[in-house]
């Protein structure tokens, strides 16, 4: 029996396949413009890997979970975060999820989600913000963190993503090193997420 978890987020889709109690394989892919098309590609990939979907237990989550017609059940991301964290840690924890379109802070007590806070009103403090800033710098989003380690502290003061982009463009124009701008971007999103988490309250291990 295969147990398959499919998470179609706003920017990326993640798939994990367990055979009984062991992870068999996983893969990720961009969500693209259509979660329905992404779901079809995932289905094709699973079949090509020899997975019999009819004999598998499939759970879908994420923004595009309703686009997975071959799923046996759909579950919210918050519930999945709770169950997954309890499976991995087995103790009380605070989960911080910086997604493509929102940031979630989730409190987990005795294996159950007891509280959560979601910032979905503004792109600032989300993966979209990081993606936009990386594009503005002309670098891959995966390279931002390593670049930031080599930069000097500067402040990205704008709280709005559009204004922050303009601020980054101005910094580039003034000759500020990309590494320092990357550091400012990382510090900016870290500060925003910390403010949300501090207001929410931290319990146990931060995951």
Language-model segments: what does each one mean?
Residues 1-20, 92-112:
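Gly/Thr-rich phosphate-binding beta-strand-loop-beta motif of the actin/hexokinase/Hsp70
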Residues 19, 28-31, 49-79, 114-115:
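Short beta-strand-loop/turn "lid" adjacent to the catalytic site in phosphate-handling enzymes
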């Amino acid at each position: 029996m295969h147990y398959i978890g499919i998470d179609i987020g706003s920017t990326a889709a993640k798939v994990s396949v367990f055979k009984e109690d062991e992870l068999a394989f996983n893969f990720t892919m961009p969500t693209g413009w259509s979660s329905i098309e992404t779901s079809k590609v995932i289905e094709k990939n699973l079949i090509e890997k020899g997975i019999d979907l009819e004999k598998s237990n499939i759970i879908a989550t994420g923004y595009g979970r309703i686009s997975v017609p071959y799923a046996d059940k759909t579950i919210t991301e918050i519930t999945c975060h709770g169950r997954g964290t309890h499976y991995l840690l087995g103790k009380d924890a605070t989960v911080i999820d910086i997604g493509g379109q929102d940031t979630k802070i989730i409190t987990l007590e005795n294996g159950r989600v007891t509280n959560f806070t979601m910032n979905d009103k503004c792109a600032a403090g989300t993966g979209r913000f990081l993606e936009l800033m990386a594009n503005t710098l002309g670098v891959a989003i995966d390279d931002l963190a390593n670049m930031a380690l080599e930069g000097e502290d500067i402040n990205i003061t704008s709280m709005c993503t559009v204004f922050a982009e303009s601020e980054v463009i101005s910094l580039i124009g003034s000759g500020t090193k990309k590494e320092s701008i990357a550091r400012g971007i990382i510090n900016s999103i870290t500060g925003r997420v910390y403010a949300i988490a501090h207001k929410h309250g931290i319990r146990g291990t931060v995951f």
